From Swiss-Prot:
EC code(s) of this entry: 2.3.3.10
Taxon lineage: Archaea, Thermoproteota, Thermoprotei, Thermoproteales, Thermoproteaceae
Function: Catalyzes the condensation of acetyl-CoA with acetoacetyl-CoA to form 3-hydroxy-3-methylglutaryl-CoA (HMG-CoA). Functions in the mevalonate (MVA) pathway leading to isopentenyl diphosphate (IPP), a key precursor for the biosynthesis of isoprenoid compounds that are building blocks of archaeal membrane lipids.
GO biological process: farnesyl diphosphate biosynthetic process, mevalonate pathway; isopentenyl diphosphate biosynthetic process, mevalonate pathway
Domain of life: Archaea
Keyword Endoplasmic reticulum appears in the UniProt entry: no
Record-listed CoA binding positions: 241
CDD domains listed in its UniProt record: init_cond_enzymes
Pathway in which the depicted protein is active: Metabolic intermediate biosynthesis; (R)-mevalonate biosynthesis; (R)-mevalonate from acetyl-CoA: step 2/3
Subunit note: Interacts with acetoacetyl-CoA thiolase that catalyzes the precedent step in the pathway and with a DUF35 protein. The acetoacetyl-CoA thiolase/HMG-CoA synthase complex channels the intermediate via a fused CoA-binding site, which allows for efficient coupling of the endergonic thiolase reaction with the exergonic HMGCS reaction.
EC top class, as a word: transferase
Protein's recorded name: Hydroxymethylglutaryl-CoA synthase
InterPro entries in UniProt: ACP_syn_III_C, HMG_CoA_Synthase, Thiolase-like
Length: 350
């Protein structure tokens, strides 16, 4: 029986960073209190010529290069984002031409807050498993924004991750997946509103923890896994505290979670958040390692996946594609004024 799973991965993090203390300086907040509250030292900021599309293209190109895959063999492209440059125009169709795919591709932009990219992973897995396409790709990409002066501004950031699914040359074999979803009003943005709103008390227990724990625990109970079975565990990372607490609630040792933590250095990249942690782990994983991946999306829902790393990962790690750790270290600090300019938050005229 052929394997099914992640054949290749690629990530992109913009080089620019704004530090938490710089944002807090502008708004008169205590930087030590803010850093302690969110465990976010700095966050990534897209360049003046970057958006969710360019970030997706770069992440996808890196995934294709790492896997040595003929892009014409990719038969499905899914994009998960909350940051579409166009209100009505898909990113997925742009990727088809930018990446050199054929026109006979299933292409869809997906929406479910920060877990839409992982929903694309589910869809790609289904098409590949059914034999409808040879390879499927999902991309989680965002240039997330928070209202200036509001606490979401300390974490909302930019980045993208692409995963290619197939049966040939699998680097991380899929073993199981599970979902937990409910109608929970923890986070939303109405049509025409420039910035999202969040339901304060709904964001923790009723939303993130209920769904992340529900998906992870449900998967483990259904398929007979124990915390000790996993080498690495990666959760969605809206801040630095939530994934650590989720691990504690599941009796998962912190040393299994820390290698996949990226939020401290780049903030919450939304659809790329959990996938970025997953990519970071794949950059260092060894054959036989088992990974539990649990993305989360407000509204609310969580997907859970278990992958086992294969011998192929060693070749993928040698392809000269930038690692997540390398991108975390390759940075240029900007001040708050530059940050506003890059994020196009200064309106010169309407």
């Amino acid at each position: 029986m052929s394997k099914l799973g992640v054949v290749s991965w690629g990530a992109y993090i913009p080089r620019y960073r704004v530090r938490t203390e710089e944002v807090s300086r502008i708004w008169g907040d205590d930087p030590l209190r803010i850093v302690d509250m969110y465990l976010v030292d700095e966050k990534s900021v897209e360049g003046i010529d970057e958006d969710a599309v360019t970030i997706a293209v770069e992440a996808a190109r890196r995934a294709i290069r790492r896997g040595g895959i003929d892009p014409r063999k990719i038969g499905a492209v899914y994009v998960g984002t909350e940051s579409k440059p166009y209100a009505v125009k898909p990113i997925s169709s742009i990727l088809i031409d930018a990446l050199g795919l054929t026109n006979n591709v299933f292409a869809v932009d997906m929406e479910f807050a920060c877990k839409a990219g992982s929903d694309g992973l589910v869809a790609a897995i289904g098409l590949v498993e059914a034999g409808r396409v040879e390879y499927g790709m999902t991309v989680g990409t965002d240039t997330s924004q928070g209202e200036p002066g509001e606490h979401l501004e300390y974490s909302a950031s930019s980045g993208g991750v692409a995963l290619i699914v197939g049966k040939d040359g699998v680097a991380a074999e899929l073993e199981a997946m599970y979902a937990f979803v409910s109608d929970t009003p923890d986070f939303w943005r109405r049509e025409g509103s420039p910035y999202p709103m969040h339901g304060e008390g709904f964001t923790g227990e009723p939303a993130y923890f209920r769904h992340v724990i529900g998906a992870a625990k449900g998967l483990m109970e259904k398929y007979g896994y124990k915390p000790s079975d996993f080498t690495y565990v990666v959760f969605h990372q809206p801040n630095g505290r939530f994934p650590v607490r989720a691990a504690s609630m599941l009796n998962i040792p912190l040393d299994k979670v820390k290698p996949g933590i990226v939020v401290t250095h780049i903030g919450n990249t939304y659809n790329a958040s959990a996938l970025m942690g997953f990519a970071k782990v794949l950059d260092i994983a060894k054959p036989g390692d088992k990974i539990l991946l649990v993305p989360f999306g407000s509204g609310a829902g969580s997907n859970a996946f278990v992958f086992t790393v294969t011998d192929v990962v060693k070749d993928r790690q040698k392809m000269g594609v930038p690692t997540v750790e390398e991108m975390l270290q390759d940075k240029i600090l900007v001040d708050y004024a530059q940050y506003l300019k890059m994020r196009k938050m200064i309106k010169l005229f309407e």
